[in-house]
């Protein structure tokens, strides 16, 4: 059977763990009128209760659902049957019949661990015996538990014997069909836990010593600082299961102690175990659809953090233009950006959604590739309907639904129309080189989720200053960057006083053309006007960061810094190179290209007190992933039919591996040529750059260059050695991945969606796709 690899999680440690008080006797517990309590057995003179959480849409007479029963922890000595109530409620809401079961413990009945195991098996047997009445599939019953309860659960699926001879349905199997184990006690050897309590029954009662190919699929959660269950024990258990051909998942949470999965210890870990339990059961085919983060949010004792989010996106800033990313060949000083990077996490393999402006901005706000719309190549020019349809959810609409105030200060570049304020007539670009003062905007940012907008449409219209839905003045373009700095700082100061979380999107005007550094920045770099403009841009970033810090909200604010694509040819790239500055660092190409220089971008995140400083991530991420990442951060569900190309990389913020949510990442050049990145392989459906760097496509065809390019990005980051002819199988696989992702309307996990157009051309360099 297929198995998963071990994932290790780095999360903030707490050094105490929750215990649950022992009671003097076993009594019926009240969970509410929606929970049914029944006695599943009587032992040691006490009635043992099992509590059923029923799916709302479940008809037991005709519907057979999978079931799960949870056993509390407490060292076989005590514990509360309420420990896993929220997990039971969650899984019932997701469609399973969920139970929490009481069982005998030393403090109440004076019984040893063997009695706990007997009761666990009796509970599973009781559920299977009554499966028809309860509407349960008798072949899909999971046992779950934490600590000693994890031992009980594991024993029901792995250990033979230990059945209560007084069970009324002794002929019915007590074996669980899946195991959900939270820091379980599953090694009872002399070097394990509890050997002194189970000496006579060892090794038969020790799950780790009884693994066979018949064992059920298992998921285990463990903290790396667990003093009772060593990580080595968990790894050995996982390896033994996999070697036996049993499907196994192990998640180790770095720095976490025993009991870490309880919300009172680590809300983040608690949430994560909900999600991964759901995904595990989904893998087994017991659940359908994605985890319900909104329900998890409702079940939490305390609301999850709602940090302010400041997203700063430069325009045409190259990867190598940030000095800390290009220490050898970066000649432009960027102290503020470097400081931001040092204070948080650097993503070294981050990409824009496209190698050019408009598509990247569309992808950021919608979580969807722009080529799924009417715009198949190039950029928009304004004076036309907004590229984001009114019904499509955006990051801004989603955040606003969660109580955020939202603002954009800067460049929109996603089209909107202008109306004459007197007549309501739509204005045409041919008659208005610059939108007139007073022109109204019916479909701008304030109609796509933003409460406030101050900025401009794109560089050619930069003189027209817009606030909310109106052109308010004309101003010289040299003043735009200082204006955006002033407006952003003012917004942060005002929003910080409201005590309401805010999302501020700052798509800067620089260092895109027109390259217009302010007078005090002219000549500062000693390199070129472009370099001066980059230095001024760095200063603006510093002003925004200072505003956050001076308002005392750095602990509650996630700052993201990036660029929309690589550096433009307008920077005079060759002249800068002659002076020792490489705008793309070690990468080939620049803005508009399929090569890395076109779309590999600086990407930093700072969240003081949450993201560790001086850290980095080599996960392959994309600006388009921000929608899913923000939704994940806020424990909220991505709206239906939204963010089809967005995959959360939230675990990376904590130093954790990011689970695969897609086969690969799709790249696109200014001319619409496609590329596909999967692991360290990158396929380009172009003979040349696909953009502005030589050889362009027509010249590459004349030179009879191969129709495809395949690079090993890890071994050849400069994309100098085309391996397509040597690895045709890999090129073909990546091509099929790309083809599938295009036609199914999404590149991430989930149901197929619809593209806005049926005319997406996979191959842009001829009438038919050449054979691989």
Functional labels for PLM-detected ranges:
Residues 25-62:
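N-terminal cap/lid segment of alpha/beta-hydrolase-fold proteins
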Residues 63-74, 310:
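Short beta-strand element of the alpha/beta-hydrolase
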Residues 81-100, 332-341:
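Short amphipathic alpha-helix adjacent to the substrate-entry channel of hydrolases
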Residues 111-132, 275, 387-393:
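Alpha/beta-hydrolase active-site loop
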Residues 116, 227, 235, 244, ...:
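Formylglycine-dependent sulfatase
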Residues 122-198, 202-203, 207, 434-435, ...:
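Primarily recognizes the serine-hydrolase "nucleophile elbow" in alpha/beta-hydrolase
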Residues 220-222, 226:
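Short beta-strand/loop motif that positions the catalytic acidic residue
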Residues 242-259, 455:
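Catalytic histidine neighborhood in serine/cysteine hydrolases
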């Amino acid at each position: 059977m297929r198995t998963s690899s071990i994932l290790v999680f780095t999360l903030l440690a707490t050094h105490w763990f929750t215990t649950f008080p022992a009671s003097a006797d076993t009594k019926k517990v009240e969970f509410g009128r929606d929970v049914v309590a029944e006695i599943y057995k009587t032992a040691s003179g006490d009635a043992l209760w099992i509590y059923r959480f029923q799916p709302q849409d479940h008809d037991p007479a005709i519907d057979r659902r999978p079931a799960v029963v949870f056993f509390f922890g407490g060292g076989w000595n005590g514990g509360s049957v309420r420990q896993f109530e929220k997990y039971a409620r969650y899984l019932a809401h997701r469609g399973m019949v969920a139970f929490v079961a009481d069982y005998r413990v030393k403090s109440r009945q004076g019984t040893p661990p063997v009695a706990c195991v007997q009761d666990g098996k009796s509970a599973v047997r009781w559920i299977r015996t009554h499966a028809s009445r309860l509407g349960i599939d008798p072949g899909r019953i999971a046992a779950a538990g934490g600590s000693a309860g994890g031992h009980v659960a594991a024993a029901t699926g792995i250990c033979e014997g230990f059945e209560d001879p007084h069970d009324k349905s002794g002929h019915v199997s007590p074996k669980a069909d899946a195991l959900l184990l939270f820091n379980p006690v599953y090694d009872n050897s002399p070097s394990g836990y509890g050997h002194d309590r189970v000496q006579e029954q060892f090794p038969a009662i020790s799950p780790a010593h009884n693994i066979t190919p018949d064992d059920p699929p298992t998921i285990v959660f463990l903290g790396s600082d667990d003093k009772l269950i060593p990580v080595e024990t968990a790894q050995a258990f996982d390896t033994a299961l996999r070697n036996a051909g049993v499907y196994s998942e192990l998640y180790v949470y770095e720095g976490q102690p025993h009991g870490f999965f309880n919300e009172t210890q680590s809300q983040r870990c608690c949430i994560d175990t909900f999600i991964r339990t759901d995904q595990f059961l989904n893998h087994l085919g017991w659940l359908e659809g994605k985890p319900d983060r909104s329900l998890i949010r409702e079940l939490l004792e305390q609301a999850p953090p709602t940090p302010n989010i400041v997203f700063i996106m430069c325009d045409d800033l190259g990867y190598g233009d940030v000095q800390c990313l290009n220490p050898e060949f970066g000649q432009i000083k960027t102290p503020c950006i470097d400081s931001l990077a040092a204070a948080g996490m650097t993503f070294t393999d981050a990409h824009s959604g496209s190698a050019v402006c408009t598509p990247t901005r569309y992808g950021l706000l919608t979580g969807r590739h722009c080529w799924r719309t009417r715009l198949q190549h190039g950029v928009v020019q304004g004076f036309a309907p907004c590229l984001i349809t009114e019904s499509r959810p955006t990051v801004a609409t989603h955040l606003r639904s969660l109580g955020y105030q939202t603002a954009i200060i800067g460049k929109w570049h996603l089209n909107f129309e202008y109306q004459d304020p007197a007549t309501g007539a739509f204005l045409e670009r041919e008659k208005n080189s610059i939108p007139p003062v007073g022109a109204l905007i019916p479909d701008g940012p304030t109609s796509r989720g933003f409460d406030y907008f101050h900025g401009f449409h794109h560089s050619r219209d930069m003189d027209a200053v817009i606030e909310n839905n109106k052109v308010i003045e004309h101003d010289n373009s040299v003043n735009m960057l200082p204006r955006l700095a002033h407006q952003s700082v003012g917004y942060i100061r005002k929003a910080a006083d409201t005590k309401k979380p805010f999302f501020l999107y700052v798509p800067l005007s620089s260092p895109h053309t027109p390259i217009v550094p302010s007078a005090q920045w002219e000549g500062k770099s000693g390199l070129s006007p472009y370099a001066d403009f980059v230095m001024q841009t760095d200063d603006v970033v510093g002003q925004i960061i200072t505003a956050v810090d001076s308002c005392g909200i750095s602990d509650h604010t996630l700052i993201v810094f990036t660029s929309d694509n690589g550096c433009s040819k307008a920077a005079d790239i060759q002249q800068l190179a002659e002076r020792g500055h490489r705008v793309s660092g070690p990468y080939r190409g620049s803005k508009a290209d399929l090569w890395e220089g076109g779309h590999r971008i600086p990407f930093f995140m700072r969240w003081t007190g949450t993201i560790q400083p001086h850290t980095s991530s080599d996960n392959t991420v994309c600006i388009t992933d921000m929608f899913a990442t923000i939704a994940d951060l806020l424990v909220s569900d991505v709206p239906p039919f939204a963010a089809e190309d967005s995959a959360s990389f939230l675990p990376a913020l904590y130093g954790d591996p990011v689970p695969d949510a897609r086969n690969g990442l799709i790249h696109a050049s200014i001319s619409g040529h496609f590329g596909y990145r999967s692991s360290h392989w990158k396929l380009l459906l172009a003979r040349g750059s696909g953009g502005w760097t030589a050889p362009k496509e027509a010249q590459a065809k004349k030179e009879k260059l191969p129709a495809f390019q395949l690079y090993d990005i890890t071994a050849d980051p400069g994309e100098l050695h085309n391996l397509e002819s040597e690895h045709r199988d890999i090129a073909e696989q990546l091509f099929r991945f790309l083809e599938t992702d295009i036609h199914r309307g999404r590149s991430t996990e989930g149901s197929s969606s619809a593209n806005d157009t049926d005319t997406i051309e996979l191959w842009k360099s001829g009438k038919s796709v050449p054979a691989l």
